[in-house]
Amino acid sequence: MLKPGMILCDRYEILDVVGAGGMSIVYKARDHRLNRNVAIKVLKPEFSNDKNFVTKFRIEAQASAGLTHPNIVNVYDVVDDEGIYCIVMELVEGITLKQYIEQNGRLNMETAINFSIQIASGLEACLLYTSPSPRD
């Protein structure tokens, strides 16, 4: 786990943990070269020595980097800093849909439709970009 104040690639300063998934941890960081906050998705250390996981992580980064859509975060950089594998992305401040529902209760029809349209629009962009096969 990276610590606040740690610098990656002489550029990205780790500020805080944003969240974690099965194979990665997401940090809020400061890009000192471009003077902006970013999200950095870091492959967990237990997977860093596994060539298959590193390959999957790089493929994810490359696939994400090619997508441009208002409902999909932008990928800015892919980093390998002494065995620390990272995807540097646009930082989206706010709450998750789950948190929104927990705070506001059940979605009314108009809000549910609005969110669904935004999600579907982002998914459509992913599908068009990746050219899925019938098995997908």
PLM feature spans:
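Flexible N-lobe loop architecture of eukaryotic-like protein kinase catalytic domains
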Residues: G19, I59, T68-N71, I84
